[in-house]
Each structure stands twice: as structure tokens, then as C-alpha cells.
Amino acid sequence: MSHELKTGGDRGYLRIATEEAFATREQIDCYLRMVKDGTADKGMVSLWGFYARSPSERATQIIERLLDLGSQRIRHMDETGIDRAILALTSPGAQPLPDIAEARGLAARANDYLAGQVAAHRDRYVGMTTVAPQDPEWSAREIVRGARELGFKGVQINSHTRGQYLDHPKFDPIFCALADTGQPLYIHPATPPDSMIGPMLEAGLDGAIFGFGVETGLHLLRLITSGIFDRYPQLQIMVGHMGEALPFWVYRLDYMHQASVRSGRYPFMKPLQKTILEYLRSNVLITTSGMAWAPAILFTQQVVGEDRVMYAMDYPYQFHADEVRTHDNLAIAPATKKKLMQTNAERWFSL
């Protein structure tokens, strides 16, 4: 069923899109340089070698839209009834850069730029801090700056950083800063590291089609099984794309995790205070980005609870009015739909 999309809450709720991307020209130019000089990993060559160089309509349109935080983006939000967009620097951010000083500078300048755009469109935009996990101590300070000086409402990290995952103890300063500020961490996909990408790349499955979700789901699962939520019980981690498959897998994840712990198969795998399902229901938040499919949305609400699922568009990578209508037309109670589209985001991002 088609209906006109308007902002302002005419259907009983505002629409807050929670995983929306932007880029800076410096960032795109940096990726191009890395692709050309051979310092990019295979995933960056595949993803940004295409988007930043292809003359195809999809690639050129996405770059144009990523670089625009002005009138075009506001117009697109108006056309699809999006009242507010929660913005973060597009993946992989500053994380692939081999020069740590350059990574810090790129991230800080992107944060300053985003803060200016949020200030200019305060009723439409919300910002998330980008960091350079290559330097965990600096990233911790930048999280605090983002929260307390720039007015940002969360932190986005684009999965692995040059093949390293956040369960490594070296990244603990980042989690200390998240605890100090009370901000959520959004783990956004990135292309898999070279150690994982081979079979995906040779089949064209390394990007958003499959590799993104598999790699990000792995990252979240590593964090859960490492005991991150036992060490930081108030921490909230967000993931997109209906939970990167973990809600569907969770019964078997719990069964096999508990079997491994009991058997002592992996000496480093320790008992947890809760089951994986319980952590999904207490510490993980899920957005619908790129997954405008009623069965998946309803299933995920059933698994993790209606308070833990939030709407997202995934602009500009997916920008379709009918995907907004799919959410509007879900056969759920009005109060549940308002949580999905508006009030869960207001709660968890402290809007």
C-alpha cells in the first residue's frame, strides 16, 4: 500500500533514521591514495576502488550524496518523511590508515565538520563521534570531546581496525571512555580483513551483500564471549542490518558456547554471567538498516524485545521510499511502531 511520506509525525510518530552516513573529501582522497599506492587492504580496493573511481550511476550518486550535508540531503529526508538522521562518518572511517597521526587528524577534522553541520541543522541532524582505534588513548579522549564539547550522542567504530578487534585488551581505554560518558557504541560493518576476505572476494560476496554482516556479527560475538558486558554491565552496543544475523543464530550460539565452556575445549573461553540471548536483551540494540523486510523485523522484535529495535535507512547506500512505507505498514501495535520509529532512538541516543 502506497501513501504519501511526510515529516512532522502525521502517522503518530516521528521517523528517526539511526544509521546514516556522510563522508569528507579528505577521507575519499585518502582512500584513493591508498588504493593507488598499494597500502589499501583487499577490502578497501574492492569497495573504495569501485565507489571512488567507477563512472557508474550508483557509484557517482553515492559519492555525491555522502559528501552533501546540505540542501540535497535535507530534501531527500523530506521526500521520504525522515524527521531526523543520526549521522556518522562512512565506513571504514579513519581505521585503515597506517599513519596513526594522519588517522587522528582525519577523524578529528571529520568530527569538527559534522559538529558544524549538526549546529546548522539542529532539528534534523544528530552526530556520532568517529575515532582512530589505532590510538586507543587518543580515541578515548576524542569520545569525551565528542560527548562533552561537540554534543554528539554516540560513537561509531567500523568493525575491525587493520585486522584487530575490540575484544583485545589494548582497546580498553575506549570502553572506559564509553562508560565515563554513558554513550552507546555503534559497530558498523567494514569489509573483512585480508585474513578472512579471500573466498568472499572471489565470489563477489565481500561487501554489503554478505561479507559486511558476517564480519560484524563475528565482531559482536567476540565481544560478548570475551565478557565485555560483564566488565561493563551498563554498556550498550548497537549493530545494524537486523543484528548481523545473531538473533537468528542465538539458540545455537548459546548451546555451543555453553558446551565449549563445559568441555574446556578452548582454555580462553570462560563462563559468562548471562547467556548470549540475555546479553542481546540487555546490552545490544539493533537497527533495521538495509533490512526493510517485515518477517525479519518482527522476528527480531520477538527475540530481543520491542524496546531494542530501531528504524534506520542506511542512506545513501539504500534510499527507497517504499522501504520507509514497509516500516509504516508493519502489522504491529501503534505503541510498538512508535518505539521502532521514534522513541527507542530518543531513549538510547539520549535525544
Where are each of the predicted segments found?
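Catalytic pocket-lining loop regions of alpha/beta-barrel enzymes
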Residues: L5, V118, V144-V304, R308
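Short glycine-enriched loops at secondary-structure junctions
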Residues: P133, P189-S195, Y315-Y317
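Mid-to-C-terminal alpha-helical segments outside catalytic/metal-binding sites
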Residues: M1-I16, A23-R84, D112-A120, R141-R145, ...
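Acidic-and-aromatic substrate-binding clefts and catalytic sites of carbohydrate-active enzymes
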Residues: I62-D68, Q95, P133-S139, R162-P169, ...
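Divalent metal-dependent hydrolysis catalytic cores, especially in the metallo-beta-lactamase
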Residues: R15, E57-Q61, R65, I74-L97, ...
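Aromatic-lined substrate-binding rim segments of carbohydrate-active enzymes
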Residues: I74, D78, A101-A108, D167-G182
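Non-membrane alpha-helical structural segments and their capping/turn regions in soluble enzymes
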Residues: L67, R104-N111, P136-A140, Y165-H168, ...
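Surface-exposed, active-site-proximal loop segments in enzymatic domains
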Residues: T90-L106, E137, E202-L205
